Amino acid sequence: MNIKERMLLREKFYSPYATKDKESIRLIPLEEDIRPNFFRDIDRIIHSTSYTRYMDKTQVFSLKDNDNISKRMVHVQLVSKIARTIGRALSLNEDLIEAAALGHDLGHVPFGHEGERILNKISLKHNEGYFNHNVQSVRELMDIENDGEGINLSIQTLDAILCHNGELELKEYHPKKKTTEEFLQDYE
C-alpha cells in the first residue's frame, strides 16, 4: 500500500457531506502521484508567491508598535488548525479544509478589511462592481500566479475560498453538493 492509498483510507469514515478525493475537479487534469488531490492543493498554495507574501503582512493595521498584533501568516495557520479540528469532528475532508483555509486571505489588500472597504467604494463609484478579497484570492490563484497561468487548484478548493464568507451575504448556511457543470459555471 502506497502513501496515497493509506491517506485515502480515512475516506471510509467521512460524513455523507464530505467531498472525497476522487470527486476533485480540475480545469487541467494532473498526472497521478503519491499525494491525494486536495493535499496537492495544499502544497500548491504554500509554495505559491501569494502565500509567501503573507509572511510580513499584519492581520490588522495599527499606527503603534504592538506585539499583540499578529501577522497574517499566523492568522491563516490558526484558521487552518481550527477549521481542520472542526472538520475532523464532523468527519469531513481535512485536506480540502486546510487548502481552503490557507488560501482564504490571499486577496487581501493593504490595510486589511478597511482597505477592502475603500476599494469597494471606489469600485462601485466607477460602476466596476464590488471589490471582495475572497474574489481577489481566487483571481490571484487562477489568473496571476505562475506568470498568469494560475496554479491549477481543484474547483472545490477555489469554491471554498470564494465562498468563505458566503453565509454572511446569502444569510444561509448549509452544505450543497454541486455537479461538475455547476462548479464550472461559477468560474466562467
Please report, for each region that a protein language model flagged, where it lies by residue.
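Active-site flanking loop/helix segments enriched in acidic
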Residues: 26-33, 37-47, 51-74, 175-185
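Alpha-helical phosphate/pyrophosphate-handling elements in metalloenzyme active cores
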Residues: 64-96
